[in-house]
Amino acid sequence: MERITVTLGERSYPITIAAGLFNEPASFLPLKSGDQVMLVTNETLAPLYLDKVRGVLERAGVNVDSVILPDGEQYKSLTVLDTVFTALLKKPHGRDTTLVALGGGVIGDLTGFAAASYQRGVRFIQVPTTLLSQVDSSVGGKTAVNHPLGKNMIGAFYQPASVVVDLDCLKTLPARELASGLAEVIKYGIILDADFFTWLEGNLDALLRLDGPAMAYCIRRCCELKAEVVAADEREAGLRALLNLGHTFGHAIEAEMGYGNWLHGEAVAAGIVMAARASERLGQFSSADTQRIIALLERAGLPVNGPCEMSAQDYLPHMLRDKKVLAGELRLVLPLTIGKSEVRGGVSHEVVLSAIADCQQA
């Protein structure tokens, strides 16, 4: 069992990583006998894990209710959020309740925002079941729902009480979802850790076949990097913005194409290549490094071009609603070398449009 701490003073919390955690009541820190829980999951995961997690919590003396939501990015909405509030109020659950998010990024983000909002804040625990949520979205306290005009536009910074990463969940993950998570994994190497990127080049095949030791190391390293960044910059005033490499372009794809048509990691993968192309055009990133990124993304089964249905101009309205925009000026996360990146303002629309055009599908 691996345990990593996200260090935030009194709000510090553990990330527990191992196989078989759903069999151990002690995994679900800080729950104890007599606590009340609302377990939030979706229609796809409920048949796989709901009874197992409910059973282990009930054996520990925890009182468990549950709400099952529809599955998909398109349901990360205010309407579905209200379903969680209604379930909490009907029981009823008070301020001493704990929400448990059993699912991927959609369930984690939505449940976290419900916890931040319900009765002005209740405790919640992240139990991520996808690679993407295990390495990224479950750690750091970003919670949100989408708006038709933009992704994650309605939300809050609200840290979980703990994160429980059961590696066995990856055995039921569809191949497309595994690839989507690998986009965020590869991102960490590009922005923060050149050695990790090189390790990924040598071990990607092992990850694709769900090799246990390789996957455990991969998830641990990503969580270590994320925990370090969050501890240094919880509310994204500077360093944490680097974690958004590819996301300004990627969120534009998700919003324009309709939430759920492109998986988040797929859109981010294409966005990473667009960011690399923009950095190339600014003379600060080598074409050789861009090709290394493209090669690794393609080996993971990820797109390296944007959707053919979108023109370069279609991206800009969405990008200008990005949360990093200041005083109407676009700010992009751009790679400088493999393992180092920056947030750069003042990038001309011409450079942005040219970078997107470089990545248009035929």
Curated annotation (Swiss-Prot):
Enumerate the Gene Ontology biological process terms.
amino acid biosynthetic process; aromatic amino acid family biosynthetic process; chorismate biosynthetic process
Query: Which top-rank group of organisms is this from?
Result: Bacteria
Q: Which InterPro entries match?
A: Dehydroquinate_synthase (IPR050071), DHQ_synth_AroB (IPR016037), DHQ_synth_fam (IPR030963), DHQS/DOIS_N (IPR030960), DHQS_C (IPR056179)
Q: What family is this protein classified in?
A: Belongs to the sugar phosphate cyclases superfamily. Dehydroquinate synthase family.
Cofactor mode of binding and number, as noted: Binds 1 divalent metal cation per subunit. Can use either Co(2+) or Zn(2+).
Q: Which UniProt keywords apply?
A: Amino-acid biosynthesis, Aromatic amino acid biosynthesis, Cobalt, Cytoplasm, Lyase, Metal-binding, NAD, Nucleotide-binding, Zinc
Question: Cofactor(s) for this protein?
Answer: NAD(+); Co(2+); Zn(2+)
User: What's the chief localization of this chain?
Assistant: cytoplasm
Q: Key word Metal-binding present in the record?
A: yes
The name this protein goes by in its record: 3-dehydroquinate synthase
What's one Pfam family the UniProt record gives for this protein? DHQ_synthase
Q: In which pathway does it act?
A: Metabolic intermediate biosynthesis; chorismate biosynthesis; chorismate from D-erythrose 4-phosphate and phosphoenolpyruvate: step 2/7
Q: Which reaction does it catalyse?
A: 7-phospho-2-dehydro-3-deoxy-D-arabino-heptonate = 3-dehydroquinate + phosphate
Q: Which GO terms describe its molecular function?
A: 3-dehydroquinate synthase activity; metal ion binding; nucleotide binding
Q: Which residues bind Zn(2+)?
A: 184, 247, 264
The entry's localization annotation reads: Cytoplasm
* Enzyme type, top EC level: lyase
Name the job this protein performs.
Answer: Catalyzes the conversion of 3-deoxy-D-arabino-heptulosonate 7-phosphate (DAHP) to dehydroquinate (DHQ).
Q: Which residues bind NAD(+)?
A: 71-76, 105-109, 129-130, 142, 151, 169-172
In short, the EC number is: 4.2.3.4
* Stretch forming the signal peptide: none
Give the CC-aspect GO terms.
Answer: cytoplasm
- The species is Salmonella typhi
For this chain, the annotated S-S bridges are: none
